[in-house]
């Protein structure tokens, strides 16, 4: 009887040791996800991921006016960007990138973007000519950048330290309605068993394409709300994602639909998107209007 008890205790001890080790390993594989707050009155989007071994991965970065806070973040973390993903070329996403690429104190190893040639943008969204000119001027005037640019392929998986970035969406040249937003690159980041979906400014048409081609891959624990939380991705897409946490790159005026100092005085659809998330019973929200948020993800 004593031998049986002894064996049982040994087995229990081994199980506890294995479970404890697995827990420690998992805890040591966390990442820090930073959602940057705006430093101007404009809407913007910028995220940083700090991996287990302190590699820095960026998604967009905000406007040119937001560049200083991102520069400070990069330099305080060693001055090296392992990978920079640009979802699309609008200035509220790529403006900070345009400034920081000219900083000799910052090294960028790889730049991931899925873009058309300049003429396509001018033909399909001439109203954003200034954004288009600014972005392509940076590429044309810094030829060394072109050696760092990688154009990812659909369904490609990019391993960076303890995270894996899956490319669910790339440029959509056939979609010419809301052309630049609908050309947003869509990323799904996995760390351990947690997933984060970055939609950029995905619109209705690109939502439909994502649902058709990537429906089984869209479910994610965390989602970045498309087009700053309004007039972006469809409710159907969010239902498929079924997130537990929402990341809102949304300033206060847009959150409140406030165009003149009065809530609900604007034309924006943020309140509608908020209702969608209530119906999905999402309990946790990180909102740009509340300032920079640093999130630890296991």
Features from the language model and the residues they span:
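N-terminal Sec-pathway targeting helices
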Residues: 1-15
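Binuclear metal-ion centers of metallo-dependent hydrolases, dominated by the metallo-beta-lactamase
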Residues: 110, 118-181, 252-298
């Amino acid at each position: 009887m004593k031998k049986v008890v002894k064996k049982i205790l040994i087995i229990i001890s081994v199980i506890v040791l294995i479970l404890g080790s697995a827990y420690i390993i998992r805890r040591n594989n966390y990442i820090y996800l930073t959602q940057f707050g705006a430093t101007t009155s404009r809407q913007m989007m910028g995220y940083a991921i700090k991996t287990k071994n302190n590699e820095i991965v960026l998604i967009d970065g905000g406007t040119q006016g937001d560049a200083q806070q991102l520069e400070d973040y990069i330099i305080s973390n060693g001055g090296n960007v392992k990978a920079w993903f640009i979802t699309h070329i609008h200035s509220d996403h790529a403006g900070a990138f345009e400034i920081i690429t000219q900083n000799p104190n910052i090294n960028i190893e790889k730049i991931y973007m899925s873009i058309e040639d300049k003429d396509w943008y001018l033909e399909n969204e001439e109203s954003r000519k200034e954004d288009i000119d600014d972005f392509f001027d940076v590429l044309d005037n810094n030829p060394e950048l072109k050696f760092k640019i990688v154009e990812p392929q659909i369904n490609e998986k990019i391993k960076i330290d303890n995270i894996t970035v899956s490319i669910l969406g790339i440029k959509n040249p056939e979609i010419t309605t809301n052309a630049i937003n609908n050309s947003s690159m869509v990323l799904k980041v996995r760390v351990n068993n947690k997933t984060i979906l970055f939609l950029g400014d995905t619109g209705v048409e690109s939502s439909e394409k994502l649902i058709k081609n990537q429906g089984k891959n869209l479910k994610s624990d965390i989602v970045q709300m498309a087009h700053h939380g309004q007039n972006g991705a469809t409710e159907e897409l969010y239902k498929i994602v079924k997130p537990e946490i929402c990341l809102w790159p949304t300033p206060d005026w847009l959150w409140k639909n406030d165009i003149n100092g009065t809530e609900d005085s604007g034309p924006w659809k943020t309140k509608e998107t908020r209702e969608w998330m209530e119906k999905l019973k999402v309990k946790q929200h990180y909102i740009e209007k509340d300032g920079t948020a640093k999130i630890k993800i296991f």
